[in-house]
Regions:
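Short beta-strand element of the alpha/beta-hydrolase
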Residues: 22-33
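Alpha/beta-hydrolase
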Residues: 31, 58-60, 121
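Residue in the alpha/beta-hydrolase core beta-strand immediately N-terminal to the catalytic nucleophile
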Residues: 59, 93-94, 117-119
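The serine-hydrolase catalytic nucleophile loop
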Residues: 34-46
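Hydrolase active-site cap/lid region
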Residues: 110-180
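N-terminal cap/lid segment of alpha/beta-hydrolase-fold proteins
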Residues: 1-23
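Alpha/beta-hydrolase active-site loop
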Residues: 40, 70-94, 100-107
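Conserved alpha/beta-hydrolase
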Residues: 48-65
């Protein structure tokens, strides 16, 4: 993909379930969020009571192994999704996104007509929510205002140096984002 490669895992359907549910999509493409690995999300599939579809998970740009390879996150999520579907020869699939993957899956579905069904699980409407939702409710509008008007830059830089000292989750997210 581009100058690199995407990691993908394919788990084939249970043939007995496929014959019992012939109307089910043949494939479910599962997508992680901001910091996931393809190997992590496959664990969700263990909880399906039946599995009449193949499951494909992948690390898109800016996720999992692609981060380690220096591939940055890209907003046009339909492109890596279509590349994975092309690689596996998938004509039509349902798609599920978890966390920020819920946002990404909707983007992919909006521009990839081969996605027939969408499940946005535990999603965020914008990446900034991952930083502001853990804040006390009274501070969220202030954070939104600062990010919405990133001037002066020194103020943003100072806030990003100080805030992580008081919030381990924010500290980790900013550290993770520095790789993207």
């Amino acid at each position: 993909y581009g100058d690199g490669a995407l990691t993908a895992i394919r788990w084939e359907a249970d043939s007995a379930d496929r014959s019992r549910f012939p109307e089910a999509p043949a494939t479910l493409v599962m997508m992680n969020g901001f910091d996931g690995y393809a190997e992590e999300i496959i664990g969700f599939a263990e909880h399906f009571s039946s599995r009449p579809f193949d499951i494909i998970t992948f690390d898109g740009p800016g996720q999992g192994n692609t981060v380690l390879a220096g591939m940055p996150l890209e907003p046009e999520w339909e492109h890596p999704t279509e590349a994975v579907m092309d690689y596996f020869g998938i004509e039509s699939a349902a798609a599920l996104g978890v966390s920020f993957g819920g946002y990404l899956v909707m983007r992919a579905a909006a521009y990839c007509p081969r996605i027939s069904h969408v499940i946005a699980f535990d999603m965020m409407y914008r990446l900034l929510d991952g930083l502001t939702l853990p804040l006390p409710r009274a501070l969220r509008p202030i954070a939104d205002a600062i990010v919405g008007n990133p001037r002066p830059a020194w103020l943003i830089d100072a806030a990003m140096r100080i805030a992580p000292r008081f919030n381990a989750d924010l500290s980790w997210k900013l550290q993770q984002a520095s790789h993207l």
